[in-house]
């Protein structure tokens, strides 16, 4: 279902202190955009309505986060979710940057100087048709780009409801010299402790769909 255009979304975002309207300007220098420049930087690709980032950011003030999505109409909901979480926990909102970006062009805003230590990919489009598979966020074409700015030993945390995407992604990671250090095909019964349930995850779980999850380490 396509989200209706919200003409008020961009003005609200531009009035937000942690929104970055032109992320290309910070390529290679992201650490200096945060208050604590010594914190490691984690990246969420496709933050959606911000449920995941709101919890992670407010629970981990010692980590800096970059959260991206493509639509203002989605980003403005993420902004509100993040603000609410920090307000409820009485935390200073100084470790999150929210921005619009096409993930296929992620290499236009990040490079090896940015030293990203972890990437989160949650419930991305599975692109099931063969002619579209190169658009997958876990495809080798994308993983090659991530390797440029992900530190050696850095991790990609990947969650999906889609069986085919998950199994084929295992091959993508192998091809791009990542080691799978954790894997489960039933996350909610796995005993994995620090799982933040996203809006999509909750929906799929209620339908009885098992959630697949892995951690891949850059070698």
Swiss-Prot record:
<feature type="binding site">
    <location>
        <position position="69"/>
    </location>
    <ligand>
        <name>S-adenosyl-L-methionine</name>
    </ligand>
</feature>
<dbReference type="InterPro" id="IPR003358">
    <property type="entry name" value="tRNA_(Gua-N-7)_MeTrfase_Trmb"/>
</dbReference>
<keyword id="KW-0808">Transferase</keyword>
<keyword id="KW-0949">S-adenosyl-L-methionine</keyword>
<dbReference type="InterPro" id="IPR055361">
    <property type="entry name" value="tRNA_methyltr_TrmB_bact"/>
</dbReference>
<feature type="binding site">
    <location>
        <position position="102"/>
    </location>
    <ligand>
        <name>S-adenosyl-L-methionine</name>
    </ligand>
</feature>
<feature type="binding site">
    <location>
        <position position="125"/>
    </location>
    <ligand>
        <name>S-adenosyl-L-methionine</name>
    </ligand>
</feature>
<dbReference type="GO" id="GO:0008176">
    <property type="term" value="F:tRNA (guanine(46)-N7)-methyltransferase activity"/>
</dbReference>
<feature type="binding site">
    <location>
        <position position="161"/>
    </location>
    <ligand>
        <name>substrate</name>
    </ligand>
</feature>
<comment type="similarity">
    <text>Belongs to the class I-like SAM-binding methyltransferase superfamily. TrmB family.</text>
</comment>
<keyword id="KW-0819">tRNA processing</keyword>
<feature type="binding site">
    <location>
        <position position="44"/>
    </location>
    <ligand>
        <name>S-adenosyl-L-methionine</name>
    </ligand>
</feature>
<comment type="function">
    <text>Catalyzes the formation of N(7)-methylguanine at position 46 (m7G46) in tRNA.</text>
</comment>
<protein>
    <recommendedName>
        <fullName>tRNA (guanine-N(7)-)-methyltransferase</fullName>
        <ecNumber>2.1.1.33</ecNumber>
    </recommendedName>
</protein>
<keyword id="KW-0489">Methyltransferase</keyword>
<dbReference type="Pfam" id="PF02390">
    <property type="entry name" value="Methyltransf_4"/>
</dbReference>
<dbReference type="InterPro" id="IPR029063">
    <property type="entry name" value="SAM-dependent_MTases_sf"/>
</dbReference>
<comment type="pathway">
    <text>tRNA modification; N(7)-methylguanine-tRNA biosynthesis.</text>
</comment>
<feature type="binding site">
    <location>
        <position position="129"/>
    </location>
    <ligand>
        <name>substrate</name>
    </ligand>
</feature>
<dbReference type="GO" id="GO:0043527">
    <property type="term" value="C:tRNA methyltransferase complex"/>
</dbReference>
